[in-house]
Amino acid sequence: MIDCIEFAEQAYTYRDRHIPYKELDCQAFVEKVLHDCGVSRNWRGSNHIWREALKWRGTYTEALVKYGCIPRGALLFTVKTDGGEKKRGYNDKDGNACHVGIFTGEGYGAMHSTTGGVQQARGDDRRWTHVGLLKDVDYHTDGLTDREMLEKILDYVKIISEVLKK
């Protein structure tokens, strides 16, 4: 399993390499960074990654609520409800994940490949609608996040307060 920091830092090394899109599209870029970290994958596109490669996925806001931030090395997706997934053989209601990038950390943004080639973008760019955590990457989220721990403590305080009132 790859450490999320290693994965994010490896993605960031591509910022000045000027690799054209015809060499690496967005899905191939994610695969290349994984390969550089020792993991080989052969996905059919960003829709395949969205459906098969993630241990967690949700909207950008859901990720912020669950983790308190976007974890370094998380995949950022543009997911549309335009039916484009059907052309790619997916007949579910999971949307059309038409673009993917790698979040490299606060202040560093995201690395992705577009028609302009591999480039850096803001991590909070409106293009990114969803976040996914790869099964192959350790995001250090196995334990409770600070937010989840606080919610549990507050739940216990409510229970104890009710018991003490009786």
Language model: regions and residue ranges:
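Non-catalytic ligand/cofactor/substrate-binding and regulatory segments of enzyme domains
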Residues: 1-17, 118-147
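N-terminal capping segments
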Residues: 1-44, 71, 79-99, 138
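Generic secondary-structure transition motif, activating predominantly at the C-termini of alpha-helices
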Residues: 8-16, 54, 158, 165
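Soluble non-cytosolic domains of exported or imported proteins
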Residues: 20-25, 64, 147, 151
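Hydrophobic beta-strand residues in large extracellular and virion-surface proteins
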Residues: 30, 34, 74-76, 102, ...
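...with weaker cross-activation on analogous glycine-rich loops/strands in unrelated enzymes
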Residues: 39-125
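Short, low-complexity, charged amphipathic interaction modules
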Residues: 145-166
